[in-house]
């Protein structure tokens, strides 16, 4: 576990996100944000692993994250996304959606915008469970089954999809500029097109009988392949990693045994999507890597991975062998290696983010882990 710095922060960490870096620069990320949950006072915090955060204190180790600033957050931070270099959007268990501004010169945070009851039931608030940003647009989802579209610097709501779901929506991501994907508590993946009027999804895919037990397993997280937008990864209550091709059928293409309990987040590497990362309630963080130069799937870290292939159809475009590894688990065309990224621990790894060679994650063990040398 070389290259990992652990920082104990006395708060359960629910979300971790790197501040984006310019795509034209070759620099590695050095600033990240965290949100906390299940604490007496929750907060959003900004941390540095670069020169900004160098401390002369004797008890600080080189490379340890240094706290730059923090701000009290009303309710649990259920999701967190950078809108741009300066602004961060949070989703709260109170139903609120907040934009915070990070002032780099003074190293302070302030509330830039607040939609207090973005998600609600008739008589009380509903947790806002997910947020995704494509500046200036912000999409949120909640336990109330609503999808909300906001625009930064505009007070009102741009669009509301009422009763988008009769069950709780757990996560959201952009598929394309005008299309989003949501996952819900009954194992469904839904596609929505904001160009279409009305409250109906353009497509519904379902785990259904494809789950390990055949039951409707709640899905907790979703991410799309950065280059092949039709390829989507999800994770849920049963800990399985599901790969979907939204152009084909209405069930996942591949299911892979990943974790022994809930998978909280899954992320393709944004610039090297042959790499994927997942974290779980079981205390593990896995690095999945596709490879096409050997015939046998291998696993590092002492766990068995079984791959259930639903289809062996080769998708159009892209690196066929690497994409086939995601879609089919076909070891003759490509295979998956899985590596444990953290020392064994008992408490949940709630969130992760990866950018360049840097990975950050947050846990219920009140710790933040940073790895600056992820083998990508």
Where are these regions (language model features)?
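Short C-terminal beta-strands that terminate individual repeats in beta-propeller domains
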Residues: 5-7, 68-71, 114-122, 159-164, ...
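Canonical WD40 repeat/beta-propeller blade segments in eukaryotic WD-repeat proteins
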Residues: 11-23, 75-82, 118-134, 166-174, ...
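Short coil/turn segments within WD40 beta-propeller repeats
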Residues: 38-45, 94-98, 129, 144-148, ...
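Blade-level signature of beta-propeller repeat domains, shared across WD40, Kelch, NHL, RCC1
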Residues: 350-376
